[in-house]
Amino acid sequence: MSVWRFGNMRNNFQMSQKLSNAHWLKNIFRLFAKKSPMRNAAIDLEAFYHKIDYYFKDATILLQALKHRSYLTKTGEDRFESNERLELLGDAVLGLVVTEHLYKKYPRETEGILTNYKSLLVSGRLLAIIANEIGLGQYILLNESEARAGGRKRSSILADAVEAIIGAIYLDGGLDEARKFIHENITFRLQELLQDEHLRNNKSLLQEYCQSLNLNGPFYRVDEE
């Protein structure tokens, strides 16, 4: 019976390759997550593609980008099947695109100021906000215990998943597609971030401003902590 089921599953995968990427990935989600919140996520996959404004040619890359390491304890897969490697790649792509954007947009700013701008745009807090905006949490594959513990709303998991998505888009569609996603979702937010008191590093900004005017560094006195 188990052999028949495996053969049946393999045939289903072969048949699904003839369908659209979205339909094929829906079938994958149903096979791997029948009893998890992902069973509802497959229904909204078209909406997810629309939100990220990208359709994957190889949907297995997207599947891996959504796979948190906790999920591997459920499937027994190798640790390399989680989204951590894609997260590393996406972090590098994000850093490149953001730095390139800042270099071109602010030709008169110092390296230190640009570094501060970059730190705002690649921050985990901002990436988590973006994840919530596109509804990414409901698609992330977690094991039951991580899901019950609120993993779908945990900022670190959401931010890592956004980086993994960027890495996946880069592998599937190239740098131009990854750059498009980053510009549509991240780089335009700089002025808004600069006005956010919780995100600004005022001490660093003051120091860089002094350096830009060839002044000595500011003197700090801590009155209380």
Region locations from a protein language model:
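Double-stranded RNA-binding/processing signature
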Residues: 1-225
